[in-house]
Amino acid sequence: GRGGIGTVFRDKKIKAIVAKIDGVKGNLNNVVDLKPIMEKGKKFNAEMREFDDDQAEMRTKGTAHLTNVMNDYDLFPTNNFRFGSHPDAEKVHSEVYKKFFTQGIPDGCWIGCNMSCAKGVDNYLLRTGPYAGDRVIVDGPEYETAASLGSCAGIFNPDFTIEANFYCDTYGICTITWGTILGFVMECYEEGILNDERTGGLKLNFGNADTAMELLHMLAKGEGFGVTAGLGVRAMKLMFGEKGWGDPKFLFDIAMENKGLEYSQYVSKESLAQQGGYALTNK
């Protein structure tokens, strides 16, 4: 869903597309030789049941199990990719998210998968925005969202991440893109490229969860600095440079995007494959 399809939907006044068919089953794609696949599937499912609770814990934590793994290996994007780890990351440890996730129900993305790593937060009380006071179901957060709407903006608060996750889904905004945008504008603010006058009074320091949430709602309503942030990292770095709001080379260095698409949430220094994915993406 990344790359602008949400903008196309909005232009066409489409909220969502739902495809439904009768008779959903594991062999929906009509494979040529089903028997060996079923045998491998049984083996894979048995291994998940036996080992997952002691290894990745995907069945109870989903992809959010990666938060502490990435932090331990200095690969957890922090403060707009300045750092790969942070002492406060313990506040968003996978054990913390595990307590938020509803457990014990089949919540997978496909029939027959007994890992069911797609997690959700049920009965979550919203504190801000148009649905403040409502209790809702939040899909996720997945790892990418836990990092983008968290450490990338210097925010280590699961409640912020879960609520921002809900509103990004509701507003039709990519959580990865928005988190990387947040990291960029926060670094610009801390480096003096942006100031209170240019942000309309928003104090966009790393870690300022209240202002980050306010900016998300402004973006959705097309108000104030939310309009500027909504342009994306590439457009902002060019615009700020043209306005003389900072050294264009420095803006280029801190703009985590390629071909106009904001980076996903991995510090790529340890992975040539990840670097290639960022640099050679066809968007």
Language model: regions and residue ranges:
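Extended C-terminal regions of large enzymes
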Residues: 1-283
